[in-house]
Swiss-Prot record:
GO biological process: adult locomotory behavior; feeding behavior; homeostasis of number of cells within a tissue; insulin-like growth factor receptor signaling pathway; mitotic G1 DNA damage checkpoint signaling; mRNA destabilization; multicellular organism growth; musculoskeletal movement
Record CDD domains: GYF
Superkingdom of origin: Eukaryota
Effect on the protein of changing S273C: In PARK11; uncertain significance
UniProt source species: Homo sapiens
Name of this protein: GRB10-interacting GYF protein 2
Effect annotated for changing D349E: In PARK11; uncertain significance
Record field: compositional bias (Acidic residues): 289-298
Compositional bias annotation for Low complexity: 1013-1025, 1090-1104, 1202-1217
Length: 1299
């Protein structure tokens, strides 16, 4: 069959056989894959499924009564979403073969698959190809099913036809447990969705290309079909009963020949392939099964043969030389396994198998090393005696062979050419063998292909040809052409083998006869129902024999579709394997089903003996024809030699013509009969036109030993007159012939000498050739040495380059390390510096902590002292209580005088306030700057009679006077000592420059305060209502003190002001730092420390104020203190502090008195006027605008807070007990923000320095404020506050008196 025709029929054989159905053994036609007409509008499966809505309501038309019996409430889901039932699964899992067998045995259906449940017909599907003709099987990723044979493959409706299509004929493997099915995820459908337009039967080639084009590790390996390689695995759960496919990976690379030209003879010998491609078996195997899967790369020629890229054949194979292999019938296979062989035939098999396994991996070279190795690799089953005879005859039987032929030559005086002729014939045969040998794959000689040992070896060269080459598809032929020298040696060895074979034939005949008798005796002795008839063997596609299996197992596998019609099977009693289709044809039924068993098959041994005899006869005929042709050539040469001596007569001319005619006839017969056997054919198979069919003819003489040219035997077809002429000519020249014989003998001797000379010359030539070979070998060694030297030089050069590169890398690394080291050093230095700073900070913290501890200790001592003083004060208070009655009359008089003084002071204070308002650029009437919160105090007081008020005040003033006398001297002394101690402690660091001038005594300060208090009382009494609440009288006194002394603009609760003022001004024993500046923020210092002694100090201090009330009555000093404390209160407001800080930063030209400007701005109500004043004094800058914006925001917040406090004031007064005002909590410490020693130092400084005093700003945190001086009127304050000489008239308050 031509190559072009073959490529057209490259599809699977079983599919063509099923489609045609022409042969007897093919099953009936199964439904072919129909070609549906494509619809005009096609929708994908997902598109159709997307149209299905589970929630669709039933149409109203169907709700009629007539439809109710057939109406279903819930819509049926699409079949793609419904899992298969068991029956459907079984139907879709059946293969073509099984369905065909069921129909053959009468158990199957007609033309469709058994069962179409739920009314589904073959037309129901998702478009093309979804009918009952689909026979499914699972991929690698589907789970071993529930059926006993592993046939429970989950076929899901969610799989499309394309996803299932090319896996229809696949069968599950032996151990595929625990793989996820399609719906559980996994790469099942990777690379599987091919939208085929044609049916699957036409698409095998396109699909193969698409498969191979995909990801090598992905789709086709994971979801590809497993096809034949797994179909032949035995299904026993614990592994194969004989050598399984997993054990021999080499077999996977054998080429599966497509049996061309032999379809009529071997229709069932083809191996069924899943998609028709010759490499399906290899592709269907997992990668881990193949040793060098990644190395086996190649291509396909036009005939579909796989060509490896490792050694591509150097020349194309002629079409007439392509091999058509047929496995030798395994007639003796079971006899080996049953022990009919002797022990000597078994042991070499094992050793040969091991040797063959080793040599098979080595490849082509291993098969060419020795004849022993190649023979054992090619035919491991050959008996060892035969091999040893061949191996020994290679060496020692060459010379006896030559001597025998020389004897035959001497008889005919033709000895000189025959020895050269016989080896030349062998060389021709070997040359013919070499061409097909190069086409045989290297794995053809795998020792795992067990062949029948007793088959006689016609020629060791032909052994590989007989092996059944049914390996895994996809493993192409590997060229085994040896090198030139090895090829010459190989030719010589093969010629020697052929010569040695002729002598071994007799021994083989005897052995064959004895074995034939044994087998026939054995076959006769087997009973008809013997167990051997129930045991079956089969040969899998890898060439292995699997079994034995009983009828039930074989029947199950056959029904499941594992066996093709070309499967070689036999019973244990049969002598050879037969195709399953032939057995079914002969038996008329499936051989595995129960029924009468035919007698054992014994025909192969007779065929083998006949073949053997035909081979021997053909060899003898070939030798005889060669010899006869040689003799005719010699006679013709003699006649030509005689023609030179004398002119030929007519008889001689006729004789010469007859000789020429005979020579031409013999040559024609030799050329007609194909002398050279076609080594590409199997020896056991008859082939038309081959030498093995040559029959001996009666017309050819078997022996000719004529002594001369004229003794040449003539054909019976020679005419009679020519024979008579020859006889007469012989009689006439008998004497002449005797002389010619002597001459011939002399000539033979000369020829013998010539032959010896030629032999010597040949030996010399061989010696020369050997020397040349030796020189060539030396030259090669020198070249190899030079190449090695060159490689060594290159290696040294590379090493030098590597060393230089490493050196450069080392230098770069050192530079990087140096840079890193420098960075590390800098980092360490930075760390050291940070550590030193941290150490200094810790030292500073330690010093501050030590100072705090000192202050705490001092405070505790002071508390103890105050406790003792309070005890003494209590005793004195008791003493004074006794004297109180004596002073009662005197106090009443003093009270009248104080009322007059208060009225006078109130009048002067009102005048002064009017002047201040005019001096401050006519501030708005809503401002509270410098005003007393009289209205608040008045509103908060209940109405009491004037007599009750006076009585309460007289009693309280008397108590204050008595207490003041006792504490005056002690307080004075303790205060001076404390100031001296703290000044000494803080002299080292953190102190501020001490104010100069003499200090006023505490008594003077207390007297001034008492006068202020009396004056304020008189003012309050004039403005109060006649009736006041009794519980608010006591607090009113303290409120008036705070307002008159401090000039507070804050309208907090009066009781609260009393407790805060008295404790913060006069409780000097709780001082912290007497040198602290006037504006220092000490909010946190005023907290819980003074809460312990506040209540104790209030009573005694109130008495001292009452005592000093009578002693000093100067109104000027009261006004000075009033003015002073008004400034202090303003400065200590948090909002005022922020304004001063911002203005100090913005006042770069030093042309602004900050406290005055702040107090002025706070009284300006209109935001526009605020912006105008700030722009006029600070300039039109972005900082000034930002300050104005924040100033307005903060002022609004402060006013909101003040209003909220005023609203809460009545509630707090109702909740407070009436007679305990000193114990109320502090709420205005944040506004005052001053510690006790600060106020005391301010009193001392301002009273002692009448001309000049600096209000010093002390650092808050670590930042010092700029010292600012308050410009005041000396007529009001009693002392001068002139600015420094560098600042002329800065900070001076202008009043109406200046104009």
């Amino acid at each position: 069959m031509a190559a072009e025709t073959q490529t057209l029929n490259f599809g699977p054989e079983w599919l063509r056989a099923l489609s045609s159905g022409g042969s007897i053994t093919s099953p009936p036609l199964s439904p072919a894959l129909p070609k549906y007409k494509l619809a005009d509008y096609r929708y994908g499966r997902e598109e159709m499924l997307a149209l299905f809505l589970k929630d669709n309501k039933i149409p109203s038309d169907l709700l009629d009564k007539e439809f109710l019996p057939i109406l279903q409430e819930e819509p049926l889901p699409p079949l793609a979403l419904v899992p298969f039932t068991e029956e459907e699964q079984r139907n879709f899992s059946m293969s073509v073969n099984s369905a065909a067998v069921l129909r053959l045995t009468g158990r199957g259906g007609g033309g469709t698959v058994v069962g179409a449940p739920r009314g589904r017909s073959s037309s129901r599907g998702r478009g093309r190809g979804r009918g009952e003709c689909g026979f499914y099987q699972r991929s690698f990723d589907e789970v071993e099913g529930v059926f006993g044979r592993g046939g429970g493959r989950e076929m899901h409706r969610s799989q499309s036809w394309e996803e299932r299509g090319d896996r229809r004929f696949e069968k599950p493997g032996r151990k595929d447990v625990g793989r996820p099915n399609f719906e559980e995820g996994g790469p099942t459908s990777v690379g599987r969705k091919h939208e085929f337009i044609r049916s699957e039967s036409e698409n095998w080639r396109i699909f193969r290309e698409e498969q191979n084009g995909e990801d090598e590790d992905g789709g086709w390996r994971l979801a590809g079909s497993r096809r034949d390689g797994e179909r032949w695995r035995p299904h026993s759960p614990d592994g194969p009963r004989s050598a399984g496919w997993r054990e021999h990976m080499e077999r996977r690379r054998r080429f599966e020949f497509d049996f061309r030209d032999r379809d009529d003879e071997r229709g069932y010998r083809r191996v069924r392939s899943g998609s028709g491609s010759i490499d399906d078996d290899r592709d269907s195997l997992p990668e881990w099964c193949l040793e060098d899967a990644e190395e086996e790369m190649g291509t396909f020629d036009s005939s579909g043969a796989f060509l490896s890229l490792k050694k591509v054949q150097k020349e194309p194979i002629p079409e007439e030389q392509e091999m058509d292999f047929r496995p030798v019938d395994e007639g003796e296979e079971c006899s080996d396994s049953e022990g009919s062989h002797n022990e000597e035939a078994k042991e070499p098999d094992k050793t040969n198998k091991k040797e063959g396994e080793k040599t098979d991996r080595v490849g082509v070279e291993a098969s060419e090393e020795t004849p022993q190795t190649s023979s054992s690799s090619a035919r491991p089953g050959t008996p060892s005696d035969h091999q040893s005879q061949e191996a020994s005859q290679f060496e020692r039987k060459d010379e006896p062979k030559t001597e025998q032929t020389e004897k035959a030559e001497e008889e005919t005086r033709m000895e000189n050419s025959l020895p050269a002729k016989v080896p030349s014939r062998g060389d021709e045969m070997v040359a013919d063998v070499q061409q097909p040998l190069s086409q045989i794959p290297s794995d053809t000689a795998s020792p795992l292909l067990i062949l029948p040992p007793p088959v006689p070896n016609p020629s060791p060269t032909l052994r590989p040809v007989e092996t059944p080459v049914v390996g895994a598809p996809g493993m192409g032929s590997v060229s085994t052409e040896p090198d030139d020298e090895e090829g010459l040696k190989h030719l010589e060895q093969q010629a020697e083998k052929m010569v040695a074979y002729l002598q071994d034939s007799a021994l083989d005949d005897e052995r064959l006869a004895s074995k034939l008798q044994e087998h026939r005796a054995k076959g006769v002795s087997i009973p008809l129902m013997h167990e051997a008839m129930q045991k079956w063997y089969y040969k899998d596609p890898q060439g292995e024999i699997q079994g034995p299996f009983n009828n039930q197992e074989m029947a199950e596998w056959f029904q499941a579709g594992y066996f093709t019609m070309s499967l070689l099977v036999k019973r244990a009693c049969d002598e050879s394997f037969q195709p399953l289709g032939d057995i079914m044809k002969m038996w008329g039924r499936v051989p595995f089903s129960p029924g009468p068993a035919p007698p054992p098959h014994m025909g192969e041994l007779d065929q083998e003996r006949l073949t053997r005899q035909q081979e021997l006869t053909a060899l003898y005929q070939m030798q005889h024809l060669q010899y006869q042709q040689f003799l005719i050539q010699q006679q013709y040469a003699q006649v030509l030699a005689q023609q030179q001596k004398a002119a030929l007569s007519s008889q001689q001319q006729q004789q010469l013509a007859l000789l020429l005619q005979q020579f031409q006839t013999l040559k024609m017969r030799i050329s007609d009969q194909n002398i050279i056997p076609s080594v590409t054919r199997s020896v056991s198979v008859p082939d038309t036109g081959s030498i093995w069919e040559l029959q001996p003819t009666a017309s050819q003489p078997t022996v000719w030993e004529g002594g001369s040219v004229w003794d040449l035997p003539l054909d019976t077809t020679t005419p009679g007159p020519a024979l008579e002429q020859l006889q007469q000519l012989e009689k006439a020249k008998a004497a002449k012939l005797e002389q010619e014989r002597r001459e011939a003998e002399m000539r033979a001797k000369r020829e013998e000498e010539e032959r010896k000379r030629q032999e010597e010359l040949r030996r010399q030539q061989e010696e020369i050739l050997r020397r040349q070979q030796e020189e060539e070998r030396k030259r090669r060694e020198e070249e190899e040495l030079a190449r090695r030297k060159q490689e060594e030089a290159l290696r040294r050069q590379r090493e030098q380059e590597i060393a230089l590169r490493r050196q450069r890398e080392e230098e770069e690394r050192q530079q990087q390390e140096e840079a890193l080291r420098r960075l590390e050093e800098r980092r360490r230095e930075e760390e050291e510096r940070r550590k030193q700073e941290e150490l200094l900070r810790k030292q500073e913290e330690e010093a501050a902590k030590w100072a705090r501890e000192e202050e705490e200790a001092q405070r505790r001592l002071e508390e103890n002292r105050l406790r003792m003083e309070e005890e003494a004060a209590r005793l004195r208070h008791e003493e004074e209580e006794r004297k109180r009655k004596e002073l009662e009359v005197q106090r009443q008089k003093e009270l009248m005088r104080q009322r007059q003084q208060q009225q006078e002071a109130l009048r002067r204070l009102q005048q002064q306030q009017q002047q201040q308002q005019l001096a401050q650029m006519k501030l708005p009437s809503s401002s509270t700057w410098g005003q007393q919160s009289n209205t608040t105090a008045c509103q908060s007081q209940a109405t009491l009679s004037l007599a009750e008020i006076q009585k309460l005040e007289e009693e309280r003033e008397r108590q204050l006077r008595e207490e003041q006398r006792r504490q005056q001297r002690e307080l004075m002394k303790a205060l001076q000592q404390q100031q001296q101690q703290q000044q000494q402690k803080l002299s080292g660091w953190g102190n501020v420059s001490k104010p100069s001038g003499t200090t006023k005594s505490l008594l003077e300060i207390q007297q001034e305060e008492a006068r202020q208090m009396q004056k304020q009382q008189q003012q309050q009494q004039q403005h109060q209502q006649p009736n006041r609440a009794r519980n608010n009288t006591h607090s009113n006194l303290h409120t008036s003190i705070g307002n008159s002394v401090w000039g507070s603009i804050n309208t907090g609760p009066p009781n609260q002001w009393a407790s805060d003022l008295v404790s913060s001004i006069w409780s000097n024993a709780d001082t912290k730092n007497s040198n602290m500046g006037f504006w220092d923020d000490a909010v946190k210092e005023v907290g819980p420390r003074n809460s312990t002694n506040k209540n104790k100090n209030n009573a005694s201090l109130s008495k001292s104020v009452g005592v000093s009330n009578r002693q000093n009555k100067k109104v000027e000093e009261e006004e000075k203190l009033l003015k002073l404390f008004q400034g202090v209160n303003k400065a200590q407001d948090g909002f005022t502090q922020w304004c001063e800080q911002m203005l100090h930063a913005l006042n770069t030209a030093n042309n602004l008195d900050v406290p005055t400007f702040v107090s002025f701005l706070k009284e300006v109500e209109s935001p526009y006027e605020v912006h105008d004043y700030i722009r006029a004094y600070l300039g039109d800058t972005s900082e000034a605008k930002e300050f104005a914006k924040q100033f307005l925001e903060r002022r609004a917040k402060q006013k909101a807070n003040q209003q909220r406090q005023q609203q809460q004031l009545p509630q707090q007064q109702q909740q407070q007990p009436p007679q305990q005002p000193p114990q109320q909590p502090q709420q205005q410490d944040s506004v005052w923000g001053m510690n006790h020693s600060t106020l005391h130092s301010v009193f001392q400084t301002n009273q002692s320095n009448n001309q000049q005093s600096n209000f010093e700003a002390v650092q808050s945190g670590k930042k010092k404020k700029k010292q600012k001086m308050v410009r005041a009127d000396p007529s009001l304050l009693g002392f001068s506050v002139n600015a420094s000489s560098e600042r002329l008239n800065m900070g001076e308050i202008e009043t109406l008196d200046d104009y």
